[in-house]
Curated annotation (Swiss-Prot):
This is Phosphonates import ATP-binding protein PhnC. Gene3D superfamilies: P-loop containing nucleotide triphosphate hydrolases. ATP binds at G35, L36, S37, G38, A39, G40, K41, S42. It comes from Bacillus anthracis. GO terms for cellular component: plasma membrane. Part of the ABC transporter complex PhnCDE involved in phosphonates import. Responsible for energy coupling to the transport system.
């Protein structure tokens, strides 16, 4: 379980990114967070693995505080958290296989991984992960030779090879076309269902949130304004999430982007 206890984040310029967040996400959930740009979605997501440090409060993972973790303890906890970015975050000139093996770095010494000395078991796991997202044939291609959708699937394979217990996906389909968006989200959903990996995804699209989430969390101005099941996420609720200035026609526009 991931638990946020009175979590707040204030940026150096005084902007409040998160305001007293209290939230529990159970193991194996597929949670989609929605809200306007600047609502706090990325800040909340990235605070889980401390890519963003919080100002107040505490974040617990399986009963252990990642907020207080340091050194080896922090590295161990981060090893269980896979991160998927909008920009893919791949080494463009490296092969797909090497990018996936990057998910194993946390399990070995720095010298060993710098020299590319991964055991046979890691290689087998990397190939299995690529096969899982239907991109095994690209194992020896350079990452920059792949389409955006293929690169994002490599990112998912990297998280699988990492044997992550939690996957955080920050706007993973924002730059993808509708067909590729569907493929990437279906990959994430199937992995969630098959392996019980807790998955948190940030999305702008209302339709996609309703289609893939088991639970939707809406943020507005750094606060949770909705937290419920998909069937509870009515148009009226989405209007609250996106603010009074957003009319129904604009909500529909957001949904199809």
């Amino acid at each position: 379980m991931i638990e946020f206890r009175n979590v707040s984040k204030v940026y150096p310029n005084g902007t409040k990114g998160l305001n007293n967040i209290n939230l529990k996400i159970q193991k194996g959930e597929f949670v989609v967070m929605v809200g306007l740009s600047g609502a706090g979605k990325s800040t909340l997501l990235r605070s889980v693995n401390r890519l963003h440090e919080i100002t107040e409060g505490e974040i617990m993972i399986e009963g252990e505080s990642i907020t207080a973790a340091k050194g080896k303890g922090l590295r161990r906890m981060r090893r269980d958290i896979g991160m998927i970015f909008q920009s893919f975050n791949l080494v463009k000139r490296s092969t797909v296989l090497k990018n996936v093996l990057a998910g194993r770095v946390g399990y070995h010494s720095t010298l060993r991984t710098t020299l590319g000395l991964f055991p046979k078991e890691d290689l087998e796991l990397a190939f299995q992960s690529l096969k899982r997202v239907n991109i095994l044939e690209k194992a020896y291609a350079r990452a920059d030779e792949l389409s955006g959708g293929q690169q994002q699937r490599v990112s998912i394979a990297r998280a699988l090879a990492q044997e992550a217990k939690i996957i955080l996906a920050d706007e993973p389909v924002a730059s993808l076309d509708p067909l590729t968006t569907k493929q990437v989200l279906e990959d994430l959903k199937k992995i969630n269902e098959d392996f019980g990996i807790t998955t948190i995804v940030n999305l702008h699209s209302i339709d996609l949130a309703r289609q893939y989430a088991t639970r939707i969390i809406g943020l507005h101005a750094g606060e949770i304004v909705f937290d419920g099941l998909v069937e509870e996420a009515t148009d009226e609720k989405f209007a609250e999430i996106y603010g009074d200035v957003v009319q129904k026609s604009e909500l529909l526009e957001v949904a199809v982007k």
